[in-house]
């Protein structure tokens, strides 16, 4: 296990499969058990925080980025001057697999999309990248938040959905998993979207928890390409 101090508020920990084996756990078992994942996070924190910078009363955020060699864990301390968006920017900068165009588009979408209190599917207009003449093209996106009973359902959805340019985040909130899906309407017909969502709902349900609640209070497990990463690891 290796650690790297990104800044005063964020630690990056590289854990390979042999480290996980020594701890008697696999990536699959870790992501499939919310009690294990929380215990694992804080055990790692206690090992790497040798200078005791992360006090017990600090609010701490974790993000896990699985790969075929193990995983990367980002541990971030939250305070008024260190907002969640800044922490996610730090993580993105260290994620070599994260396409830049997905990051840029998704950040804009997250600023403009809002989920209704009833957990409805939401549409919102978002500007695409600028044209050469300086004009912008607006297109609509569909946001859906799905509640999952367990991690195996996330694997089933990852292996079932066939939507191009899909942005997907996996959250852990109050012991349950949630998928935040952002679908560019220009890349899928309404009929296809309806059919794909029907497949997803075989393994989940539409969530009444809003994206704002997940963003502020949930644990972001996989960012932007959650379904792609899950499929590559567990298909």
Swiss-Prot record:
<comment type="subunit">
    <text>Homodimer.</text>
</comment>
<comment type="function">
    <text>Enables the recognition and targeting of unfolded and aggregated proteins to the ClpC protease or to other proteins involved in proteolysis.</text>
</comment>
<dbReference type="GO" id="GO:0030674">
    <property type="term" value="F:protein-macromolecule adaptor activity"/>
</dbReference>
<dbReference type="InterPro" id="IPR038471">
    <property type="entry name" value="MecA_C_sf"/>
</dbReference>
<dbReference type="Pfam" id="PF05389">
    <property type="entry name" value="MecA"/>
</dbReference>
<protein>
    <recommendedName>
        <fullName>Adapter protein MecA</fullName>
    </recommendedName>
</protein>
<comment type="similarity">
    <text>Belongs to the MecA family.</text>
</comment>
<feature type="region of interest" description="Disordered">
    <location>
        <begin position="113"/>
        <end position="136"/>
    </location>
</feature>
<feature type="compositionally biased region" description="Basic and acidic residues">
    <location>
        <begin position="113"/>
        <end position="135"/>
    </location>
</feature>
<dbReference type="InterPro" id="IPR008681">
    <property type="entry name" value="Neg-reg_MecA"/>
</dbReference>
């Amino acid at each position: 296990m290796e650690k790297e101090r990104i800044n005063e508020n964020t630690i990056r920990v590289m854990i390979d499969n042999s480290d996980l084996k020594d701890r008697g756990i696999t990536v699959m078992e870790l992501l499939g058990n919310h009690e294990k994942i929380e215990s694992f996070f804080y055990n790692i924190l206690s090992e790497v925080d040798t200078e005791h910078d992360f006090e017990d009363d600090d609010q701490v955020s974790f993000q896990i980025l699985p790969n075929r060699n193990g995983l990367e864990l980002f541990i971030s301390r939250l305070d008024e001057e260190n907002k969640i968006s800044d922490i996610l920017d730090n993580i993105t900068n260290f994620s070599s697999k994260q396409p830049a165009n997905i990051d840029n588009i998704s950040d804009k979408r997250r600023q403009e999309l809002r989920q209704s209190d009833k957990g409805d599917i939401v549409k919102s207009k978002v500007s695409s990248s600028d044209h050469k003449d300086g004009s912008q093209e607006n297109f609509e996106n569909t946001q859906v938040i799905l509640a999952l009973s367990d991690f195996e359902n996330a694997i089933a959805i990852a292996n079932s959905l066939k939507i191009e340019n899909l942005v997907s985040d996996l959250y852990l909130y109050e012991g349950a998993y949630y998928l935040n899906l952002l679908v560019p309407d220009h890349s899928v017909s309404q009929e296809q979207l309806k059919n794909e969502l029907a497949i997803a709902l075989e393994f989940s349900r539409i969530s009444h928890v809003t994206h704002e609640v997940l963003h502020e209070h949930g644990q972001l497990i996989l960012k932007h390409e959650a379904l792609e990463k899950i499929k590559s690891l567990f298909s």
